Amino acid sequence: MAQSDPPKSPDPPLPTSIRNPQTPESGWDRIRELFQPNEQGHYPEEVGSIVKSAVTGALLGGIYGGLPAARHSKERYIQQSQAQIYQHRVEAVRSAHNAALRGFIRYGWRWGWRVAAFVTIFNSVSTGLTVYRDKLALSHYAAAGAVTGGLFRLNLGLVGLLSGSLIGAALGVPAGALISGLQSISGESIREKKRRERQELYENKVQEWSARLQVTDEVLEEMETSQQDPLEQQVEKIQELLQLPRNPAVSPKEGR
């Protein structure tokens, strides 16, 4: 009877540090994944884009509200200080510049934090819906615009809430179309890019893990070979000694 081949040992399991490249199936698991840094300590790209858009919105809002306010404050100060006497022309110019700076800071701050809050809420809601449903749709931006517009008009009561939601939803659709168009020009969306990067990272880690296992097996084989060599040499020496001819026996008479 032919001997059957010994069963192959199963492949060793991958370490826990090598995560599954597939995105989590649950929407809430994908949401929780947004707040978990990777091995390098970096947060997902979606969180980074929200922070960057908030900073950009604050800067643009500050410039949009601060520059006209600075010009208006300077002109108003000059008109109100026509009868004021200054010791030197430099003092008058400095006072006008200080008035412009105060106006820029005051109204720039007002516009800056409001635009930053608007952009942050809009991007947070749209990104959350996209991650939860794991797909990109214009309805996400419409819903984000409705939520943002309603919150900003909440102080006006129910009528303000409804009107703000309608206006926000209407403005969210073209904004979403613009964002989707920019992502299509780049070739892939953030979700597609994230899937590709997860798959590439997984493949690289598996290759590295396989290479480490191969090196470990080679080292173990060398150790076993080095341990077997001395034993084989000793066995050969014993066999050589056993094959040597025996010495002739010495009789008692010859010994005398």
From Swiss-Prot:
TM region positions: 111-131, 159-179
UniProt KW keywords: Chaperone, Membrane, Mitochondrion, Transmembrane, Transmembrane helix
GO process annotations (BP): mitochondrial respiratory chain complex I assembly
Cell compartments where the protein resides: Mitochondrion membrane
InterPro entries: TIMMDC1
Gene Ontology CC, one term: mitochondrion
Annotated membrane topology: Multi-pass membrane protein
Region annotation (Disordered) ranges: 1-27
Principal location class: mitochondrion
Origin: domain of life: Eukaryota
Keyword Thylakoid listed: no
Family stated for the protein in its record: Belongs to the Tim17/Tim22/Tim23 family.
Subunit structure: Associates with the intermediate 315 kDa subcomplex of incompletely assembled complex I.
Function per UniProt: Chaperone protein involved in the assembly of the mitochondrial NADH:ubiquinone oxidoreductase complex (complex I). Participates in constructing the membrane arm of complex I.
Name by which UniProt lists this protein: Complex I assembly factor TIMMDC1, mitochondrial
Organism: Xenopus laevis (African clawed frog)
Gene (UniProt): timmdc1
